[in-house]
């Protein structure tokens, strides 16, 4: 008797799917929009709890790690932090996330807030050779 194949999978695809289901969990924790240094208090702890609760094996940050409020194309708050202060505080806070999720397989996607410095440089016709990499800035 042939197995019900309601997904219309090819025989080799069924074998691959069954093998995947037999192996250990491959749950991915997706973390979005930290906007450091303005991240919600307790978000790191909540994310760590979800990682454990759902037996995650990988973490993906989906952008906007840094807020870069001071450099927005939109109006910024006159009472807000300056660029150096915001960046230094963001680096300190991001290091906590790095230490919490520093495992093989962690991925970081760069978001529009993360890219704003390069966008501003392009707007000002500054060659990319003058711009540091994220790794150089964040350590």
List the predicted regions and their residue ranges.
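Acidic, histidine-bearing metal-coordination/catalytic regions of metal-dependent phosphoesterases
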Residues: 1-31
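Core catalytic region of metal-dependent phosphoesterases/phosphodiesterases
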Residues: 31-139
């Amino acid at each position: 008797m042939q197995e019900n194949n309601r997904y219309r999978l090819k025989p080799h695809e069924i074998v691959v799917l069954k093998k995947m289901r037999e192996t250990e969990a491959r749950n991915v924790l997706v973390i979005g929009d930290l906007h450091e240094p303005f991240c919600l208090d307790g978000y790191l702890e909540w994310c760590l709890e979800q990682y454990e609760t759902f037996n995650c094996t990988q973490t993906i940050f989906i952008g906007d790690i840094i807020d870069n409020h001071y450099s927005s194309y939109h109006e910024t708050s006159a009472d807000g932090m300056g660029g150096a202060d915001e960046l230094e505080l963001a680096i300190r806070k991001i290091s906590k996330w790095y230490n919490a999720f520093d495992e093989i397989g962690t991925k970081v996607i760069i978001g529009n807030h993360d890219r704003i410095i390069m966008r501003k440089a392009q707007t000002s016709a500054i060659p990319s050779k003058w711009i540091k990499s994220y790794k150089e800035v964040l350590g």
